[in-house]
């Protein structure tokens, strides 16, 4: 409601500049429930990339925090900035009670109002870093995100008792879909920390909240293997990595220290982002089910199809041959922003 009151009706895209945590979660929820398009700005990218993302999306308003801006280098933001500190301070006790009752008791159609959300409506735009060229905006629809979440959920079968660690930034597709929306829509408790590099603090967090599922990058996983104590991860069930290649030495180091084998996934921002994932090897009725191999990226998620083709002839290649990857599925992006070609 507050976002709706403080922004113009013409503003379809709202910028968000916040680290992982309750603030970014609430901001993204507010924008999505108001049927706007969230644009989580990459605060680690060059200032020119942040400026480019705002211009491409024609952003007029950015949600952020004064405290967070104090620790960032100066970034070129639009003039209309809404600070979470101010928004929280202005919310009366009566409004809090009304919001609680609305969230607990109101049917979904009441929250949405007379503006139904269509599956192909754009939910978010995620940008590349823009380190070598102008950042590209990847447009992901509600259907893209929900289909990817459902496919991911069907293969890892999370429990309501699970607790997931969330440290990846929401401007990254892995953090946005897998460690923000996935646990939220699966009823899983999430333990958040703003900086994935602070391994010792994260170790205390995982112990305090009995974290059972970790989704992170191999680089961060290496830091955890070196600095987190084994007794801090006694409840750990699954570790999944993405965004970069999982080196065998990192997987072996982590498994030796904590007794849980990290499993590698594959994807891209354009795929919402998960496409394939390795799973634990299991045995059912004395029949082995192979879920992962060292020389493979894993199983394709349900609902998707992959083939490897020759880059010039598009002829389908045999297993083991190198070529272009063709991927088909409901998770494939709607396209690049302002680049219909």
Regions inferred by a protein language model and the residue ranges of each:
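Conserved beta-loop-beta connector loops within the AMP-binding
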Residues: 303-326
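Conserved AMP-binding/adenylate-forming
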Residues: 2-45, 167-169
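Conserved structural elements of the adenylate-forming
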Residues: 1, 104-110, 119, 138-159, ...
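Gly/Ser/Thr-rich phosphate-binding loop
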Residues: 211-216, 225-292, 305, 314
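Conserved pre-ATP/AMP-binding loop-to-beta segment of ANL
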Residues: 82-89, 94-127, 133-134, 157-163
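Conserved AMP-binding/adenylation subdomain of ANL enzymes
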Residues: 32, 146-163, 171-212, 227
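Structural core segment of the AMP-binding/adenylate-forming
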Residues: 2-6, 33-100, 112
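Conserved helix-loop-beta element of the AMP-binding
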Residues: 58-60, 76-89, 163-165, 191, ...
